[in-house]
């Protein structure tokens, strides 16, 4: 496995998307497509709720899988040891900071939890409080769709860098 520590590759700002124990193949397929179109690296943390060769994952990711830098890791610690993120953000409905108030840097890593339960409290507690992010929603709503949440955060980070490498 190659170590992905480079924060800028071929004129692109590289961000890392980490899906902690994702459960729903179409969401991950959509995020594969998002990664291919934004240049973000995608990391899946086991156990996965599906087989990465599953038909619904392939269908949602279309032909973008070949254009995506995606790796599957046995646990978050191994992932972090390999990508060596300068900063990581826990994205959760229990976040303390709005995602749009942060100045993002190349190499930032965004960690999202499984669709049915979100990130474990213990993992959120490991993250510095100012890096526990949330996406605003109307009161009494439970959560946003995982692939939508990833798109909102990644595109805000890339926007702050003037969509470098994009067209």
What is the meaning of each model-derived region?
Residues 1-167:
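Post-transcriptional modification and biogenesis factors for structured RNAs
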């Amino acid at each position: 496995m190659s170590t992905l520590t480079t924060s800028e590759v071929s004129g692109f700002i590289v961000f890392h998307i980490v899906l902690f124990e994702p459960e729903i193949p179409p969401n991950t397929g959509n995020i594969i497509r998002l990664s291919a179109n934004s240049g973000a690296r995608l990391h899946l943390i086991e156990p996965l709720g599906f087989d990465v060769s599953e038909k619904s994952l392939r269908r949602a990711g279309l032909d973008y899988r070949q254009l995506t830098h995606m790796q599957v890791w046995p646990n978050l610690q191994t992932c972090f040891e390999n990508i060596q993120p300068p900063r990581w953000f826990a994205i959760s409905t229990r976040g303390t900071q709005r995602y749009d108030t942060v100045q993002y840097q190349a190499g930032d890593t965004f960690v999202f939890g499984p669709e049915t339960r979100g990130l474990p409290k213990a993992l959120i507690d490991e993250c510095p409080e100012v890096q526990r992010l949330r996406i605003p929603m109307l009161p009494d709503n439970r959560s946003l769709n995982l692939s939508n949440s990833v798109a909102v955060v990644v595109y805000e980070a890339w926007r702050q860098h003037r969509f470098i490498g994009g067209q």
